[in-house]
Amino acid sequence: MPTRLTKTRKHRGNVSAGKGRIGKHRKHPGGRGKAGGQHHHRTNLDKYHPGYFGKVGMRYFHKQQNHFWRPEINLDKLWTLVDSEKKDEYLSKSSASAAPVIDTLAHGYGKVLGKGRLPEVPVIVKARFVSKLAEEKIRAVGGVVELVA
């Protein structure tokens, strides 16, 4: 934009240049610095700086994330961890000697929950945590639960 078209050029010849007669563009009309964040500048802070005011909880020093790592898997999805080639073999035999060993930890799951039904085939489940209902259902089909660290 050429200088001759700017607003400051258009204000030339007018004493206050659009800045008013009394205050004359002096002092601090909105307060100094970040004043009025909860009062007359509230809309700006709410829109552009949410969470600026208010309390924040305590930090957890030396938090070991692994203590809270517990992805869950339900019983109805447990057989998806068995290889598809071997799955048909296990389901047809259904003998306790040839029970599949499902290591949930190796597949990235920390806890077994009891939603769903299991096929009537014994299975050995290795997990860090198992819910009471899941353990009952696994035992009901002749399976075993092994807790691993």
UniProtKB/Swiss-Prot annotation:
Gene3D superfamilies: 3.100.10.10. PANTHER family: 60S RIBOSOMAL PROTEIN L27A (PTHR11721), LARGE RIBOSOMAL SUBUNIT PROTEIN UL15 (PTHR11721:SF3). Belongs to the universal ribosomal protein uL15 family. GO terms for cellular component: cytosolic large ribosomal subunit; nucleus. It is found in: Cytoplasm. The keyword Ribosomal protein applies. Component of the large ribosomal subunit. Mature ribosomes consist of a small (40S) and a large (60S) subunit. The 40S subunit contains about 32 different proteins and 1 molecule of RNA (18S). The 60S subunit contains 45 different proteins and 3 molecules of RNA (25S, 5.8S and 5S). GO terms for biological process: translation. Residues 1-13, 21-42 have a biased composition (Basic residues). It holds the Pfam family Ribosomal_L27A. InterPro entries: Ribosomal_uL15 (IPR030878), Ribosomal_uL15/eL18 (IPR021131), Ribosomal_uL15/eL18_sf (IPR036227), Ribosomal_uL15_CS (IPR001196). Residues 1-44 are annotated as: Disordered. It comes from Candida albicans (strain SC5314 / ATCC MYA-2876) (Yeast). This is Large ribosomal subunit protein uL15.
